[in-house]
Amino acid sequence: MVSLRRRRLLGLCCGPNGYVTPLPFLTAEEMITGIPNPNARAAYNPGPAETVTTVIVEKKAIEERSRRTRSKHMHFRSDYSDISPVNSDSISPKYQPPKRRKQHRRKRVHNQEPCLMRGVYYKNMKWQAAIKVEKKQIHLGTFSSQEEAARLYDRAAFMCGREPNFELSEEVIRELKQQSWEEFLNCTRRTITNKKPKSRIEHEDTKINASMPHQPEEEEQDSDKM
């Protein structure tokens, strides 16, 4: 509401006791936006008493809205200020790095062919054959080549009804059919233990021959003449 003094200063009143010209009616939308709407003014043209009451009601509604918005902003600020860095850390989930399993890789020697045979693995610079029976790993033997270890595994695989690496001959199949599993293991261990001393003896003989000096050809011819 504009005071009488302000209206006189603005030129709305004529003389000291002039008639106060009524202000034009403004709807709530016009009061908020500040843009006059001629359609709304033509549709609604109330009397002076109704105009005053509607303006008061609309002014109260605007004040109520502004008060609610201020209270919401104050409530939001208070809630935001109450959150400390410790609380924010406790609210946010703790970062846990993904667990990675260790990959056990076998050491490979230079110029070593990979283990492509079933039941064969490389350990202690030698090829070893093994088979798993009833959740137990049974060591069959140690060999210098991968093929020898695979051949022994094939015999054990035939006894257990598994797929071999190579095709077995009829003679070997006939021999294995006459043995039980325990007899096969005992026979295999016996052959491995019998092979060990021979290989050691041959290795020692080669060492002795290499250490002995060779006689020259002239001495050999003289000995033949005598």
Curated annotation (Swiss-Prot):
Molecular functions (GO terms): DNA binding; DNA-binding transcription factor activity
Biased composition range(s): Basic residues: 97-109
Residue stretches of biased makeup (Acidic residues): 217-226
Residue ranges of the region described as Disordered: 63-109, 195-226
DNA-binding region(s) from the entry: 105-171
Keyword Nucleus: yes
SMART domains: AP2
Annotated Gene Ontology cellular component terms: nucleus
Swiss-Prot/TrEMBL GO biological process terms: ethylene-activated signaling pathway
Location of the protein in the cell: Nucleus
Keyword presence, Acyltransferase: no
Family under the similarity heading: Belongs to the AP2/ERF transcription factor family.
Function as written in the Swiss-Prot or TrEMBL entry: Probably acts as a transcriptional activator. Binds to the GCC-box pathogenesis-related promoter element. May be involved in the regulation of gene expression by stress factors and by components of stress signal transduction pathways.
Protein name: Ethylene-responsive transcription factor-like protein At4g13040
Native source organism of the sequence: Arabidopsis thaliana (Mouse-ear cress)
